[in-house]
Amino acid sequence: MIDLLQIELIKRLKYKYMRAVDTNNWVELAACLTEDAVSNYDSGKYSFEGRDNIIDFLKQFMDRPTQVTQHHAHHPEIDITSDTTAKGIWCLQDIVIDLDANITLRGTGIYHDEYEKVDGEWKIKLTGYVRIYEEIEERSDKVKLVTNMFAKE
């Protein structure tokens, strides 16, 4: 029998992970990962072992007021493999606006995740995506970023 409650809890975990990435909430993001988590972002181009190493990379890569991101994970295919483990496949859509480089990046990919229940709570043990496509466009003078939650006033 499919355990829909556990699947919904895993969906909430992935949604929280994406929100934490986009809001640069590194404490909340760390809480989504097991201590020994592994990441393989962008077809393995950015691979890290250990929660702290993953968070350090993302902070270095993303935590600046001149960059904003939007990551959406949807169409989940989640399989509960035991009482404490699960696997998931997700579609990814992302947008990155980088004002320093004057570009907008848009892309899609497929996430492959593994989950582990730790002290009764689902955590991400392995996460990573393979790109379907990525396009980069130079930002025109006609396009203005008018709201940015990270900009210093």
Task: Label every model-predicted segment.
Residues 5, 46-49, 103:
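A structural signal for alpha-helical segments
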Residues 27, 31-92:
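A solvent-exposed, acidic/Ser-Thr-rich amphipathic alpha-helical stretch
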Residues 63-153:
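A beta-strand edge to alpha-helix "cap/lid" segment located at domain peripheries
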Residues 12, 49, 110:
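Short, well-structured alpha-helical interface segments that form or flank functional binding sites
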Residues 1-31, 35:
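Short, low-complexity N-terminal intrinsically disordered segments enriched in polar/charged residues
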